[in-house]
């Protein structure tokens, strides 16, 4: 189905990590052991990061990867620089040496990959990654976008693979909020509506952009939380 390897190691609030083309890890929000079990640690060359939430960046995992694989490059937007400086205030030199800091909307080339990031709409700065792989069959275009209230301003015409958040069904979510308000429960879903993408919006984006040979995968499905969480 795909011209490149696509391995969804984990997606959702418990952790996000997707391995592409046997070399690219997009987000690193899972334990090191999970990546090791998936065979990623020995193969990964580049790690693309989106935003600071811990289900997308597991700092301990990232540090262990860099310790075990010193040639790995970490690619992330400028706004994560301060986040990493805070995390590794005692010593972030090991990260700086392996960092590739990407400016929003600017295109770069590294190895057989051309890539760019575009802003999304979350409660912290966040981006979607557009990653183009040069393969023997031609250019294979992937867009990865999660944790966003909308896809406004994002265009990805005729991409080969759309990895897009479809966190909830809007009608179901609105009904759930109404029921919780009536019973006085904590409404976690209020935040979800403002920070995550509905299946309806995901479908709209995909259908507006996908071509004849495109494929898509839904990511980051909503998980109901208990009132005390």
Specify the residue positions occupied by each region the protein language model found.
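Metallo-beta-lactamase
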Residues: 77-139
């Amino acid at each position: 189905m795909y011209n490149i390897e696509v391995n969804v190691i984990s997606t959702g609030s418990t952790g996000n990590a997707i391995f592409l083309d046997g070399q690219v890890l997009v987000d690193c929000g899972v334990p090191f052991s999970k990546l090791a079990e998936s065979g990623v640690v020995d193969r990964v060359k580049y790690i693309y990061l989106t935003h600071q939430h811990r289900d997308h960046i597991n700092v301990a995992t990232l540090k262990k990867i860099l310790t075990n694989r010193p040639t790995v490059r970490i690619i992330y937007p400028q706004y994560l620089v301060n986040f990493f400086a805070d995390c590794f205030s005692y010593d972030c030199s090991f990260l700086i040496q392996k960092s590739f800091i990407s400016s929003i909307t600017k295109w770069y080339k590294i190895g057989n990959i051309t890539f760019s990031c575009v802003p999304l709409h979350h409660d912290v700065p966040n981006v979607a990654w557009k990653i183009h792989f040069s393969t023997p069959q031609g250019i294979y275009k992937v867009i990865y976008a999660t944790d966003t209230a909308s896809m406004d301003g994002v265009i990805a015409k005729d991409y080969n693979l759309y990895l897009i958040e479809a966190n909830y069904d809007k009608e179901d979510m609105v009904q759930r909020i109404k029921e919780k308000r009536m019973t006085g429960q904590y409404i976690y879903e209020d935040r979800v509506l403002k920070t995550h993408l509905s299946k309806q919006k995901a479908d709209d984006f995909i259908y507006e952009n996908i071509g004849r040979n495109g494929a898509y995968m839904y990511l980051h499905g909503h998980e109901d939380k208990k009132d005390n969480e």
